[in-house]
């Protein structure tokens, strides 16, 4: 059926007008940045385009072909495999959209024939909602499982619950009647490793034994994680978001979203988080959700046979991933729209919203943290913010931008060094070394020993009457006779100053270790470490402003709104703003990030501080480089990804960029009726191009169409097996009518059915600024360059990327995938 759809792929599109009459606007193709084949050298994968407007370029339709006639000369039966894609190749967005339109028309035309056809039509219409529902259910369930397992294994580094081995520390002490307010985390049921092994709960011996066991478990978890990744699913490492962006732009990476990757990523994500490495599970949860979406899409023919439609499901899945990662369904939809998706029609927006809703509902039903919230660090603030506080909020934004710029440069430099040195050949050793250093340094400091999510929770939490943290060790010089929600600002006690020093050390530790951790061969997210760094900085700034307001409340900046005994400053709010600023500085997200953090806090009142800090961090970060961390890793890995956010302002023409250039060999082309099967097979074997222009003759150079290498190979192999008389000397005919041949000639092979009759073309005088825009908007892989209808050359996406690198004074070879 797929091949049959391919035959109707839109070769009836005899003019631009036939495209503009498509069934819906989105089908006109807001294409994605389609990627080139990694393994080909020059004329890479080709994509037929549909539209061309403007004065400098034109849309051709196969030279002198009579476009009013039936353009297809179908073979006796469909050719299996034509229209499918190899690994590390780019999908043909236009062909996939045409296949879907043809499928839709065929179903609509048959649905009135019988009740069965009507049922099939309804099933087809609802399959999109069904697949995103299944994706949301699976994403929510897996996220709950990962949260519960990671919490239990994190606490396993410190001790074990004897009454119920599957309880973490907090759950173990829930049912105990022997806990005190000051030591609420201590109960007889929970035993540290020192108590179990040497029978001591206190003292130097106990500390050393707990230290050793902490390092042992951290190294064990890290070693198991990297070993599973290396042996079973190499694609399970890293964040996954750069590759998800690349896949959503049209690239195919077989196995990246497969069942083995899903299984290993889920298991190793728990191990990596529990090992105490400076990483988070939020980014990899997007990869896990996309794996679920990809697997479920194979249950529905509408998506399993159409790569463009499948990417709509993956966009919805990425929204579900962020929804369960942060408990932010709306933020997840905006994240998918702003950060990862390239092609995002309106119906995908609705389905993304629904997938995020279902995933959040499932996670809420599981209640992994026991607090009836979707995340561990949900907080609510009751104190309003004041205009003066915008100044420290903006300073936090500047810090976030500087941190983001530093992190991107340092991490990319380290990852590049890893690729270019022998160190990168020993991923297991690297993970063990990083885990060992992290564990040895982290244990003595209570803030780095904490699970990062718990650290963020503690930094976000406002100091209330029931808080026993050292961050809330203020001197009570007020005669408070009753417990109230809003405790007035007080002078900091010894515990607060001690905590600030520990937080400063934790900040330095987190900054250094995150640079070296992101990119190692275990699942590693960046959201939580970045938020932790910002939250530490924000809490420190918040305490400083709070003490300034307490001791100098008569200053004019405090005098109007901060009275003695009032609760003016909320340090936890500063931590939240700092977390958003640092995450924005690294990823360069804006709208989606503000909404995610707003959904975390449940307070509309703090949107303005968040917006101010996030925008400031983006501006400061952009001053050092416009790329976020994910775009930087895409460029580092050499994925030919044409970023829609980049601007092209140079005044070159298509003729300056096209190949062949001067001193290059001539362009490899096919003629419409002068070549034999052997000629074509020799050309395929001698070149590595992914397709060949078809011209009328070598003399005229008039363009007829374009034939893909894969389609030619499959069609010739199929013809040799199924059609009698096809031999090496058989004439291959791409023309509408077979030319007259001598009687003794072997049977000709008619391949007009695999010919793209409307390849996208531009003239040699088209400005490159327009060509780049066309590639982005239509998701093209290449276009042909003509002059008065005569073929001159070809421009591929790799040519554009090389040209953009040269104009930016970069080495083109350094950005292309090897």
Curated annotation (Swiss-Prot):
Motif segment (Selectivity filter part_1):
238-242
Motif Selectivity filter part_2: list the residue ranges: 280-284
| UniProt-annotated site: Mediates proton transfer from the outer aqueous phase to the interior of the protein, residues | 282
Q: Which GO terms describe its cellular component?
A: early endosome; early endosome membrane; endosome membrane; Golgi apparatus; late endosome; late endosome membrane; lysosomal membrane; plasma membrane
- Annotated residues that bind chloride are located at 239, 527, 630
List residues binding ATP. Answer: 689-691, 796-799
Intramembrane residue windows? 241-248, 313-325, 329-337, 572-586, 590-601, 602-605
Topology relative to the membrane:
Multi-pass membrane protein
Q: Where are the transmembrane segments?
A: 126-163, 209-232, 258-276, 282-301, 349-367, 391-416, 423-443, 500-520, 525-544, 606-624
Recorded GO terms, molecular function? antiporter activity; ATP binding; chloride:proton antiporter activity; PDZ domain binding; voltage-gated chloride channel activity
Give ranges for the Cytoplasmic compartment: 1-125, 625-818
Q: Please report the stretch or stretches of sequence annotated as the CBS domain.
A: 658-722, 755-812
Cystine pairings recorded for this chain: none
PTM entry text: N-glycosylated.
Q: Where in the cell is it found?
A: Early endosome membrane; Late endosome membrane; Lysosome membrane; Cell membrane
- Residues at site: Mediates proton transfer from the protein to the inner aqueous phase? 339
Q: Where is this motif: Di-leucine internalization motif?
A: 28-29, 46-47, 71-75
**Cross-referenced PROSITE patterns:** CBS (PS51371)
Q: Keywords for this entry?
A: Antiport, ATP-binding, CBS domain, Cell membrane, Chloride, Endosome, Glycoprotein, Ion transport, Lysosome, Membrane, Nucleotide-binding, Repeat, Transmembrane, Transmembrane helix, Transport
Q: Where is this motif: Selectivity filter part_3?
A: 525-529
Q: Which residues are noted as glycosylation sites?
A: 177, 451, 479
Q: What does this protein do?
A: Strongly outwardly rectifying, electrogenic H(+)/Cl(-)exchanger which mediates the exchange of chloride ions against protons. The CLC channel family contains both chloride channels and proton-coupled anion transporters that exchange chloride or another anion for protons. The presence of conserved gating glutamate residues is typical for family members that function as antiporters.
Q: Which family does it belong to?
A: Belongs to the chloride channel (TC 2.A.49) family. ClC-3/CLCN3 subfamily.
- PANTHER family membership: CHLORIDE CHANNEL PROTEIN, H(+)_CL(-) EXCHANGE TRANSPORTER 3
What does the record note on quaternary structure? Monomer and homodimer. Forms heterodimers with CLCN4.
Descriptive protein name: H(+)/Cl(-) exchange transporter 3
Q: Which gene encodes it?
A: CLCN3
């Amino acid at each position: 059926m797929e091949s049959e759809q391919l035959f109707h792929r839109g070769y009836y599109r005899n003019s631009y007008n036939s495209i503009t009459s498509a069934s819906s606007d989105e089908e006109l193709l807001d294409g994605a940045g389609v990627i080139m084949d990694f393994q080909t050298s020059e004329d890479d994968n080709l994509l037929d385009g549909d539209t061309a407007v403007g004065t400098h370029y034109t849309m051709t339709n196969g030279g002198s072909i009579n476009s009013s006639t039936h353009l297809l000369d179908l073979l006796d039966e469909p050719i299996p495999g034509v229209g499918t894609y190899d690994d590390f190749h780019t999908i043909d967005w236009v062909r996939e959209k045409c296949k879907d339109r043809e499928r839709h028309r065929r179903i609509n035309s048959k649905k009135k024939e019988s009740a069965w056809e009507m049922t099939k039509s309804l099933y087809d219409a609802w399959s999109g909602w069904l697949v995103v529902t299944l994706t949301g259910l699976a994403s929510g369930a897996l996220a709950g499982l990962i949260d519960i397992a990671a919490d239990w294994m994190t606490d396993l580094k410190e001790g074990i619950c004897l009454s119920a081995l599957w309880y973490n520390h907090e759950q173990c002490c829930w049912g105990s009647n022997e806990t005190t307010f000051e030591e609420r985390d201590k109960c007889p049921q929970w035993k540290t490793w020192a108590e179990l092994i040497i029978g001591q709960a206190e003292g130097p011996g106990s500390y050393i034994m707990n230290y050793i066991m902490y390092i042992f478990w951290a190294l064990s978890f890290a070693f198991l994680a990297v070993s599973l990744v290396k042996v079973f699913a190499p694609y399970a490492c890293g964040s996954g978001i750069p590759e998800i962006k690349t896949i959503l732009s049209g690239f195919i990476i077989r196995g990246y979203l497969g069942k083995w990757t899903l299984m290993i990523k889920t298991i190793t994500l728990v191990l990596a988080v529990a090992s105490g490495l400076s990483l988070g599970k939020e980014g990899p949860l997007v990869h896990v959700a996309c794996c679920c979406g990809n697997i479920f899409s194979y249950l529905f023919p509408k998506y399993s046979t159409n790569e463009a439609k499948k990417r709509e499901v993956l966009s919805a899945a990425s929204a579900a991933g962020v929804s369960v990662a942060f408990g932010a369904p709306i933020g997840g939809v905006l994240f998918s729209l702003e950060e990862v998706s390239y092609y995002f029609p309106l119906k995908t927006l609705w389905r993304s919203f629904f997938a995020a809703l279902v995933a959040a509902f499932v996670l809420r039903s599981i209640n992994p943290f026991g607090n009836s919230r979707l995340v561990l660090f949900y907080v609510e603030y009751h104190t309003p913010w004041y205009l003066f506080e915008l100044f420290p909020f903006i300073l936090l934004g500047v810090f976030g931008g500087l941190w983001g710029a530093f992190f991107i440069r340092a991490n990319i430099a380290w990852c590049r060094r890893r690729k270019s040195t022998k160190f990168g050949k020993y991923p297991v050793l690297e993970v063990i070394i990083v885990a060992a250093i992290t564990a040895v340094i982290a244990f003595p400091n209570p803030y780095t020993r904490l699970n990062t999510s718990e650290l963020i929770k503690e930094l976000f939490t406002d100091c209330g009457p029931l808080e026993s943290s050292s961050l809330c060790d203020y001197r009570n010089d007020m005669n408070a006779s009753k417990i109230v929600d809003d405790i007035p600002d007080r002078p900091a006690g010894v515990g607060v100053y001690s905590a600030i020093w520990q937080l400063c050390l934790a900040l330095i530790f987190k900054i250094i270790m995150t640079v070296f951790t992101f990119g190692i061969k275990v699942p590693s997210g960046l959201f939580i470490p970045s938020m932790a760094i910002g939250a530490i900085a924000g809490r420190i700034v918040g305490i400083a402003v709070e003490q300034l307001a307490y001791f100098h409340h008569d200053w004019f900046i405090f005098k109007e709104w901060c009275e003695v005994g009032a609760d003016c400053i909320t340090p936890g709010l500063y931590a939240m703003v700092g977390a958003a600023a640092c995450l924005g500085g690294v990823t360069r997200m804006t709208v989606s990030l503000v909404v995610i953090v707003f959904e975390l806090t449940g307070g509309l009142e703090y949107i303005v501080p968040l917006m101010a800090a996030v925008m400031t961090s983006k501006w400061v970060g952009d001053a050092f480089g416009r790329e976020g961390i994910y775009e930087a890793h895409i460029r580092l890995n050499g994925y030919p990804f044409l970023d829609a956010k980049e601007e092209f302002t140079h005044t070159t023409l298509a003729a300056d960029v096209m190949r062949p250039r001067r001193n290059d060999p001539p362009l490899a082309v096919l003629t419409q009726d002068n070549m034999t099967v052997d000629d074509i097979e020799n050309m395929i074997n001698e070149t590595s191009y992914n397709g060949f222009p078809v011209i009328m003759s070598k003399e005229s150079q008039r363009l007829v169409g374009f034939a893909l290498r894969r389609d030619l190979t499959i069609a010739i192999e199929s013809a040799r097996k199924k059609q009698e008389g096809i031999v090496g000397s058989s004439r291959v005919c791409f023309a509408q009518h077979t030319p007259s041949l001598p009687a003794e000639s072997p049977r000709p092979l008619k391949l007009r059915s695999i010919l793209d009759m409307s390849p996208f073309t531009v003239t040699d005088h088209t400005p490159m600024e327009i060509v780049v825009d066309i590639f982005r908007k239509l998701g093209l892989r290449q276009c042909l360059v003509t002059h008065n209808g005569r073929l001159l050359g070809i421009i591929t996406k790799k040519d554009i990327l090389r040209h953009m690198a040269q104009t930016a004074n970069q080495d083109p070879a350094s950005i292309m995938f090897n």
